[in-house]
């Protein structure tokens, strides 16, 4: 039995019978988070595509790539959004490498997250130079303006950073988005797309729970 089929997503409305208030309130929130505001629906759907690739929800990927296409996103724009997500997911792992360095060195500081720790990242250039250099090249090219602007990519990065929960990445890309011309309203809207997609990933997988529950 396949655990993922498009048709399973059709069971989602069944949740309305079992948790009606929560279901309706989520649908209302999700609709508002993805509606046009300072950011267009197209921009929000591209953010949603990126976040869906981080949550790993196949239902969300299918839905939001379709929505992005309906809102005139090109293959190239969708691909660029996905690569921002790829860079941010990988970047979250690398960024937390500074915590590993602190732990290895026996840093007794009770504060596990300080902005100053991020400066240790360059130490990986000496520890694993070729891999570090290759990642930096990939990260730089993924965030470089092309079919999507630098501002659009940094807003996607902000949403992705909130999805991975990387404090260093949130700090870096929020500042980058601001430098690229994003205002606080646009940044907030990008964050709420991430919030909706993280919640949506959990809800979407409820159809798998329904299938599992119904098995004899």
List PLM regions with ranges.
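Hydrophobic alpha-helical segments
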Residues: 1-216
